Structure formats: structure tokens, C-alpha cells
Amino acid sequence: MFKIKHLTLLLLTILTLSVAGCKSQFEKIRLSNDVAKKYQEAVRLYNAKNYSKALILFEDLTQKYRGRAEAEDLNYYYAYTLYRLGDYTTARFQFKSFADVYPTSKNAEECRYMYAYCFYLESPNSTLDQENTYKAIDAMQLFINLYPKSERVAQATQYINDLRGKLEDKAYANAKLYYDLGGYDVTNYKAAVVALQSSQVEFPDIKYSEEMDLLTVKSQYLYAKNSFETRQEERYNEAIQFANEFVESHPESKYLKEVNDLKVESEAGIENAKRVLAEIAKQNAKYKETLEKEAKRDSTRTTIKTPTT
């Protein structure tokens, strides 16, 4: 996908230059076989921030300089040209390639960092798929592991924290969505509990910890409330347990009254479920007794009507 994007950018640039004039000074250099002069012009254009033209020359030179000593600097400029043009997908590939091919270069550390930074720049907002966010975190962490004394470690660490914050936003929003959909399907309340707990395992220091613990109590309470009486006692007890854990974890929370109210309602729900089940058991016993009496009466009638021999 990134190759298509990159080629499109390159072709548009060439087309624009062609329209401007077939034999401009730039075109003469581009078509020239003097690679040294072409490289010099590419660097000049880069420094002049004319990245579109510089890219065309660097693209051509990467093939001609392959295997030569000058290729190191060329590939460094090439990666940064792509970066300056906003083609972060291709740029990160080139930065990584540079760091892998020239691990002892003075620019290897910088390129390894820029590889991770390009992933960071392509990390979308929290409502979208977070594949690049995870990759950015991995790349930043790899950089820190490889260069623990680098002056860039502090910034890389901050970027990781920013990216984790985005993942936390996503996790909280997804879990809350299950809760919001509980009115349509009661099993979504249970799904909310599972999602909330899983998110806190993945992100133990999540900034939404208090809100998520509250939502866990509410989700479990509503799951129990909308269950059959035969399952309510067990499920209400889980809600009570979550409520107790909330109070222990957040003793100064502004949600304490709401949590305690849910605990009281859960306890009342258990008592009500017991009464309903007891009444059902009573009715079942009464019905069973009636059936047994009718069966006995029918048996007696059959005995009386049976003729003797």
C-alpha cells in the first residue's frame, strides 16, 4: 500500500516538472549521467527545502550508488526527504533499512529513533484501529533498549506514555460501549464486566481506574437484576463483591454513595429472589400434592370398579 502511495507522489512530481518545461536546468541534471553532480544538486535542493525535486534525484541515485561508500549519506538524505514530504510509511521503512544496513553509522541511532517516530505520527485517534499505536510502542521500546543512554530516551518514554494513553482511551470506550448496549441484550452487561476487568489487567495504572470500577459494579448489578431468579443470588453476590472491592480501592471516591446504594439494592435483590423462589417452591409443592391426591383418588376409583371373579 505504501509503495502505491509513494509512486503516486513521485509520478505527480515528475508530471508537474514536465509541464513546466522539458529542458529546464533541473531536467538536464535529472537526465544527466553525472551522478556526482546529480547528488550535489539533490543535496542542494534538500537544504533549500525543495523536497519534491530532491526526491526525484535521490530516487534515481539510490540505484546508481548501491554498494558504494557514498550510499550511506545518500540513504540518510533519502529517508529524510520522504519524511519531510509526509510519506511516513515509506520513510519509516527507509529509516529502519538505514539502521539495519549501517548499524555502526553515526546516524544509526537517529534513524532507529525516526523509524519509531514515523509509527508514532501514523498512530490514529483512539476511535480507530490501533495497530500502528502498538507498533509505535514496540519500536520506541526497542529504541530505548538499544540506546538506554541516548538523550532521546526521555522523549521516547514520553511518546510511549502518550500512546498508552490512547490505548487506555480505546479500552475504556470499548468496555463502556458494552454497558451502553446492555439495554438491548442483557449479556452485554456481562461482556462489559469482562472487558472492564481485562482492560485493567492490560493497563494496571489506567487513568480511568475509578470510573471502570464503578462501571463494573453497575454492569454486574444490572446483569443480576435482569437475570432469572434462579441465577440472581449468585450474580448479585458478585455485584456485592465488586462493590466491596471498590470501597477498599477508592475510600475517598465521589462515587461511594452510588456504589453503596447498588450494594444495598443487590442485597435486597437477593432477598427478593429468595422469596420468589420460595413461593415458586411452595406452589410447586402444592401442585405436586394436588397431583398426588388426584392420582390416589383415580387409583381408588379404579379399584372399586374392578369386578371380582
Regions found by a protein language model. Give the residues of each.
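Acidic, polar-rich low-complexity tracts and alpha-helical solenoid repeat scaffolds
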Residues: 2, 18-309
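Bacterial N-terminal signal peptides
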Residues: 10-18
